[in-house]
Amino acid sequence: MEWEPVIGLEVHVQLRTQSKIFSGAATAYGAEPNTQACAIDLGLPGVLPVLNKEAVKLAVCFGLSVNASIPPYSIFARKNYFYPDLPKGYQISQYNFPIVQNGHLDIENEDGTTKRIGITRAHLEEDAGKSFHEGMQGYSGIDFNRAGTPLLEIVSEPDIRSAQEAVAYLKALHSLVRYIGVSDANMQEGAFRCDVNISLRPKSEEKFGTRAEIKNVNSFRFVERAILFEINRQKEILENGGTIVQETRLYDAVQDETRSMRTKEEAHDYRYFPDPDLLPVEIGPEFIEAVKNQLPELPWEKRKRFAASYQLSNYDVKLLTTQIEIANYFETVLKIDKTIPPKLAANWINGDLAAALNKNNLSITQSPINAEQLAGLLHRIADNTLSGSMGKQVFETMWGGEGDADTIIERHGLKQITDTEALEKIIDEVIENNPTQVEQYRSGKDKLIAFFVGQVMKATKGKANPQQVNELFKKKL
């Protein structure tokens, strides 16, 4: 029997606010344990939560960017469960009246086709603290710095049918929340975490199978591997006549497997009820319009503009716009020097710069070569001061911190030879020294032109303009 996976994702996005969702405590990552937790975060008696307006604004911003509806009011509820890092014994979340409802996000599959993934809802909630077990013998520690940090939980429809589609959706979502400034979405810091709900059903059936949930998967690669493992696990059980247990599972990256954690809770297990300490949030049309007017250019809008304005291929556009920082870097280069061809800038940013960043595990914001410096280098390539190979030489020297392109060109004598008279003298020598090859070329062996150009490049130590040399040879021969 052929089985079809049915996958839905719940993504927890940490909102980019200076303070927590219900208190004034800071949200900075990496502070000493328990130095950013106040009485409200710790659930101490005699204190009341106060909603952070910026968190509401960011949630609405996300909702508008995925064409969702923003209801006129939203209610916070208490989600009751016990866990050591949940100091109040409940989490303030949303249940029946979430702040974002019924949106969608389009993804591009590997074959270039587009698929629309529905977004059921996105709701605001507070994060829990963090338990520590390593380095502590016989006991565990709890850091409450994260408790109360604002989260937006984004719940997709079960529209995803493969591990590849799941990763494409997550990457599109990750890119979007960074573009609109809702979150830094730093996965290493836990600011973008994913729960995967997955079930199998016979290919021809509409009814869903029993689902398992895989909790807190924090990388695109692990999401893909966890889904592939879970599909095979469920398939093996079903084909051997067994039944799938509705449960919560954990993904073990070392063993590359999912393991049972606990039976899956239903909503009634959490005994949701409206939080009596928080009034319903009223969201008027004026507020929504104000947020809408502040929305930046969205990823798909930027892709269309890049393709139209800069005449770039889909491949180049996709690489340049995946991250907002790369797109900004590219446009900064072109604004600094309008003589630089967009294709030249795209080739260098997607090629040499991207390779150097990957090799050194750096983001583009950490690049030793800023946009102004790269613009200086590309200007010298565009005006034929440097050949492409010489440009690579200068790039490597710039990466090492030896100054801008002009300084390096002057210091190392790397200026390209473009003087026609000087080049013709060298060409005449090459022709004179290679009579056999000249005769063969004139007999129709056109590919020998590369040999002649190579001889000139060798004589000039790579400083000649190969295109110019090519044209001069053709005229001479």
Curated annotation (Swiss-Prot):
GO terms for biological process: glutaminyl-tRNAGln biosynthesis via transamidation; translation. Keywords: ATP-binding, Ligase, Nucleotide-binding, Protein biosynthesis. Its EC number is 6.3.5.-. InterPro entries: Asn/Gln-tRNA_amidoTrfase_suB/E, Asn/Gln-tRNA_Trfase_suB/E_cat, Asn/Gln_amidotransferase, Asn/Gln_tRNA_amidoTrase-B-like, GatB, GatB_C_1, GatB_Yqey_C_2, Gln-tRNA_amidoTrfase_suB_CS. GO terms for molecular function: asparaginyl-tRNA synthase (glutamine-hydrolyzing) activity; ATP binding; glutaminyl-tRNA synthase (glutamine-hydrolyzing) activity. It catalyses: L-glutamyl-tRNA(Gln) + L-glutamine + ATP + H2O = L-glutaminyl-tRNA(Gln) + L-glutamate + ADP + phosphate + H(+); L-aspartyl-tRNA(Asn) + L-glutamine + ATP + H2O = L-asparaginyl-tRNA(Asn) + L-glutamate + ADP + phosphate + 2 H(+). NCBIfam families: gatB, PRK05477.1-2, PRK05477.1-4, PRK05477.1-5. Allows the formation of correctly charged Asn-tRNA(Asn) or Gln-tRNA(Gln) through the transamidation of misacylated Asp-tRNA(Asn) or Glu-tRNA(Gln) in organisms which lack either or both of asparaginyl-tRNA or glutaminyl-tRNA synthetases. The reaction takes place in the presence of glutamine and ATP through an activated phospho-Asp-tRNA(Asn) or phospho-Glu-tRNA(Gln). Belongs to the GatB/GatE family. GatB subfamily. Heterotrimer of A, B and C subunits. This is Aspartyl/glutamyl-tRNA(Asn/Gln) amidotransferase subunit B.
